[in-house]
Amino acid sequence: MKIAILSRDGTLYSCKRLREAAIQRGHLVEILDPLSCYMNINPAASSIHYKGRKLPHFDAVIPRIGTAITFYGTAALRQFEMLGSYPLNESVAIARARDKLRSMQLLARQGIDLPVTGIAHSPDDTSDLIDMVGGAPLVVKLVEGTQGIGVVLAETRQAAESVIDAFRGLNAHILVQEYIKEAQGCDIRCLVVGDEVVAAIERRAKEGDFRSNLHRGGAASVASITPQEREIAIKAARTMALDVAGVDILRANRGPLVMEVNASPGLEGIEKTTGIDIASKMIRWIERHATTEYCLKTGG
């Protein structure tokens, strides 16, 4: 099988592991920078070119598309899909997951428990927005933020109003969310492949912070998850139509709450913490689904 990995940096841990796992299972692998792909959109002879050459057909494509290049990265992935390549996460699912507002609306519609959340662009009544989510303490986020950037814990009403007013000055979309105190700065990252949680870790915020992102200096340990947490993680990934997803869960007194569904979860922290070969599980999923029938169905 011929597999393309779409990534701006082939030296990243996740890309290297996926490449190694695919090669170990006998596949040919090429890492392509999606921003260097250019496309001929033609009903008779569509194609993808890369650095001066027309690319051959790939049986499957693994998208490792960063948030900053979502628009063009998913456009390039769509072209591969149109040419019959099986995507490990479809372009439409990635775009959907990157839209935090749409994601939360879809999850809520499916009855998946979330922290109480309010979203606004430039709220005229900051006080009402705060009341809507139950008052302080609360978390204020920029909708476009990633890896804990643009996330502030406002412990008092006055602090919340000040942060919201400051974010409003950025002309940005603002997300206001109840603070789950009992989580104590921890969350659970469940790595879903297909209909299975293949690994789970607990991420704990560093001292003096409440954000558990490993990129922000948080620590990780192996997590033992409950059947309810396993079920909600799989349901969240399925709701977003993702074959592979990192589902972040908070343990609240009222039960597990989904914080986020990540369409391009990093493998380094979770593989090194659990010792589980997740990359090979992803390649095996591709082997089962990147079939000749799929290629013919999609026009490749």
From Swiss-Prot:
Might you give the EC number(s) for this enzyme?
6.3.2.-
Checking InterPro entries in the record gives:
ATP-grasp, ATP-grasp_RimK-type, ATP_grasp_subdomain_1, RimK, Rimk_N, Rp_bS6_RimK/Lys_biosynth_LsyX
Top-level taxonomic group: Bacteria
> What's a single GO MF annotation on this record?
ATP binding
**Record: residues binding ATP:** K141, E178, Y179, D187, R211, S212, N213
The record's similarity note reads: Belongs to the RimK family.
Write out the function statement from the record. An L-glutamate ligase that catalyzes the ATP-dependent post-translational addition of glutamate residues to the C-terminus of ribosomal protein bS6 (RpsF). Is also able to catalyze the synthesis of poly-alpha-glutamate in vitro, via ATP hydrolysis from unprotected glutamate as substrate. The number of glutamate residues added to either RpsF or to poly-alpha-glutamate changes with pH.
The entry's protein name is Ribosomal protein bS6--L-glutamate ligase
Q: Which organism is it from?
A: Escherichia coli O6:H1 (strain CFT073 / ATCC 700928 / UPEC)
The gene is rimK
